Amino acid sequence: MHAGLLGLSALLQAAEQSARLYTVAYYFTTGRLLWGWLALAVLLPGFLVQALSYLWFRADGHPGHCSLVMLHLLQLGVWKRHWDAALTALQKEPEAPHRGWLQLQEADLSALRLLEALLQTGPHLLLQTYVFLASDFTDIVPGVSTLFSWSSLSWALVSYTRFMGFMKPGHLAMPWAALFCQQLWRMGMLGTRVMSLVLFYKAYHFWVFVVAGAHWLVMTFWLVAQQSDIIDSTCHWRLFNLLVGAVYILCYLSFWDSPSRNRMVTFYMVMLLENTILLLLATDFLQGASWTSLQTIAGVLSGFLIGSVSLVIYYSLLHPKSTDIWQGCLRKSCGIAGGDKTERRASPRATDLAGKRTESSGSCQGASYELTILGKPPTPEQVPPEAGLGTQVAVEDSFLSHHHWLWVKLALKTGNMSKINAAFGDDNPVYCPPAWGLSQQDDLQRKALSAQRELPSSSRHPSTLENSSAFEGVSKAEADPLETSSYVSFASDQQDEAPTQNPAATQGEGTPKEGADAVSGTQGKGTGGQQRGGEGQQSSTLYFSATAEVATSSQQEGSPATLQTAHSGRRLGKSSPAQPASPHPVGLAPFPATMADISPILGTGPCRGFCPSAGFPGRTLSISELEEPLEPTRELSHHAAVGVWMSLPQLRTAHEPCLTSTPKSESIQTDCSCREQMKQEPSFFI
């Protein structure tokens, strides 16, 4: 089917471009120089498309030979992409890398073809439609050119939608009937819109630009109100809204990952109202109804009717998720569903548990270490494990700026990393060029997980816990992959005496005295438990990002779904030998985080960046010392380098470590025991 779609796209493009060139020559040979120069000027925006195609070739690793430059100067760069994609599609039994590369080639081709159609074919369609109507349907050359341009622009929209959907994980094959319905939908809506604008221009001339400008402005503000998260940069986000608002003058494209039923209905209702008003004004129907005016209005609006019927048929019968769409419409019409907002809510159970933990956090006041489980795109294979943080972060930024990463975000209609990681699981890696190695994320994680389990417990010296925490992995046979956003807060409290602990909180730990001594050693106190310097310690906040898997614990039936972390009684800075940690304590599920996937996130405090830890007075840690305990992690996986991001919000008294479910605000006063059981509770964001 790939070869057939590529062949159909090439055939329509060849017919449209041939008709366009013949129309230009026809105008010059017949002495209609104005139309000839206007038709020739429409070709100029095509150089922007060719420039983008050339830059994308270079980004994919193609050498910038003179032949490649000449092809793009002759506006044949898109044709070269057609040729390359056809060669890849016609290979017998292509391997998985070739299939992934074919998807990227088709995505590049469909995006460039859509851009070329909007910049060249759209203006040419409007121009030739006006010339054809001005000649009272007698000039056959502009009429044929109008037909091919109309079909080509509609197919460019269908092809873009199809190939973007093909990049989604778990996609289903789209039958030819679905493509035919989409083509009728696009042609019907485009035909009505183009005829309305051209007829209004014939009657009111340049006032049509006022109408188009007002429509552009309204659509741009509407897009801003919808808050699409595909683009991260503020400047680029504004430019994106302006460009999409210009596209909405003619057609509709969806850029939101939420259900677009209400948006689509709103857009087409506005278009129907606007087209009807333009037709009534253009045909002088308000001054006096005539049979000719009625025929014109009915003929033009019949295209909108055909497009609407095709749209309904496609989404109700031929869409890959037509059953879910139909059931959603029925639930909403019956009042069962509460709308799109209910589909975006977090898990009530997780929210309730997080709320309870926040309310019962007690009087422990101290540093907060937040572990936000989010996905990160892996770094290239070319980056050595000993490379510094700056090098690997630069490589990651280069990956995120690659145009193939933009296709992933456009296909999923979101730029949220957690949503993208939730969509692309272990069995459906993101397809990227071989140089980026994104499809090898599963192998890296599996190797890191297995290597981490092989580490002996004796090698985990307590001194290494000054800058990092060791967590046990979860076996894939015992865990279901599920995208979570979890918060782990390490609060520390300092007390002169060892606090009273309940049995549940002290399971797997040392004695209370040992715990108090450990905290004293951590905070730099003397033997008597007094602080050095007499002043409150500055608290620090570590922010990390990691991927996680939620384990299904069968032994905790009947209890709240709380993932508990194995805590071994080793304390920061403890001088006495630590008890070996049990890999799987009874009743405690292992922490579902892979150390090889942890990467830093900048804190929210006033002092952001790499800085010495304030929790160890009298000693300044260098960057190399901070990264030293994490070197085994880098050896396990060439992931983004893990650093320690510190934010020093205020002076506090240091307290003993305590693990809670949500990050605590620095101003919250609590009254709980400071030796509380370490827990990790997932919060789901869909």
UniProtKB/Swiss-Prot annotation:
Subcellular location: Cell membrane
Bias (Polar residues) ranges: 455-470, 490-509, 550-567
Gly residues composition bias: residue spans: 523-536
GO CC annotations on file: membrane; plasma membrane
Membrane topology note: Multi-pass membrane protein
This protein's UniProt keywords: Cell membrane, Membrane, Transmembrane, Transmembrane helix
Subcellular location, principal: membrane
Region (Disordered): 340-362, 444-470, 490-589
Family to which this protein belongs: Belongs to the XK family.
Name of the protein: XK-related protein 5
Gene responsible for this protein: XKR5
